[in-house]
Amino acid sequence: MPPRKRIGDIMLEHGFITEDQLQLALVEQKKTGELLGSVLFGLGFISQKNLFKVLSATQQDDRSAPAKEDSGLDVPEEIDYLVQQSSAIFQKTTDLHKAELDSPHSPLVNLVEKILINGIRRGATDVHINPDMKGVRIRYRVDGVLHHGMFLPGKLLNPIVSRIKVMGRMNIAETRLPQDGSAEFFYKNRGLDLRISSFPVIGGENIVIRILDKSQVLVGLESLGFLEEDIESIAESLALPYGMILVTGPTGSGKTTSLYSFLSMINSVNRNMFTIEDPVEYHLPLARQAQVNVKAGLTFATGLRSILRQDPDVILVGEMRDSETAELAVRAALTGHLVFSTLHTNDAVSSIVRLTDIGIDPFLVSSTIDTIVAQRLARILCVHCKEPLPADNPAYQAAAADPAVHTLYRSIGCRACDNSGFKGRTVIYEILKVNRRIRELINKRASIDDILQAAIDNGFHGMNVIGMKKVLLGITTLEEVRSLARSAN
């Protein structure tokens, strides 16, 4: 069977682009990981019409031929199919508004499904559908970083948005106001929850879809990246009959995953466990889980009040968003319950001050909080392409690493990691254990610096220490840890 023609070659043969334009596009493609056709279209080197001609030609080739890793010209099979689908739909745009927005046989439904499946395959947590001056830009957030997916013709924006709104049970006629919706999506016998947000911007409506896989298996703390000695410290806190354990960090830092891993360590038939969340991200056996429904009047505060009448042993409050919820959670911890929750603070010590700043009595804070874990997620170097740094690289001196003992690495990029150089993430964290001295300082409304010094005297170290350990182990890069340390400070 003859080798499949590459898209770049076909474009050159037809005179649609020049060799110089192709080389420029390949350089850009290596930076972004984008489809070659999308790069050429985005740079203005090829028109939509000519791009679709090339895609039609590639469709006639053998689709089973594998792409060569070093060519830089072949399009991955599932992406190629998605682009060809968009081409077919674009040719039928006059019929798009006549098509049923929820018909399984509609080409529009098929296109939206392919966009979602592509994100799921890439391990995306979010799918972004953005109006762009040149068309519709599809992007995927993978390992915390947005990656280009593809460009679609601008005429497809409104039909795609309408289809997604139908899925999310949103008002397709309302385009002037932001809306939120949710949908269930099945892929390979897995039920996924989609959280949909629309926002009107210049050029149309911007759509972001959060992908939640409730069926994913909870992993242990070691798999998340916690070190053995710190797992033992956390286990000691989990053995307490009452008190409060907090996990803090920005959105997307893995707080919920860590909390559920904590809960799974103590989940048993002998404990009555409740959660109130927005949304419920994991299913936990034996736990009674509730989801916030503001429209129906079920908030974190009202849910927590009712849970306290259900004879709970362990309570997870997804987030302490306001003073009412925070005070209820703190009082629950004071009255014989083990309470878990999250806060949006940059570091562990700041969480203490945040609670007192929103009006919680320092005595209640000092009497209930036992452990605070602040965390970030660092990208893991791709094992297939990471490259050792030479011994004279300045990174060794910056990391205080001896090249004879440790090997530092840099990211390169390959097909296995979608040319990003990273695959997966590991937790970078700090653990604050609230001892007697820190409790005294909380009661005195001491400053963050005073509490931090007391914590250091008790063996506390910042998350940069854990980060540097993982650099020396070859798990991540010095640049990645430095970036996270800056955000923590």
Where are these regions (language model features)?
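Short, flexible helix-loop junctions that flank or precede catalytic/ligand sites
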Residues: 18, 96-118, 122-489
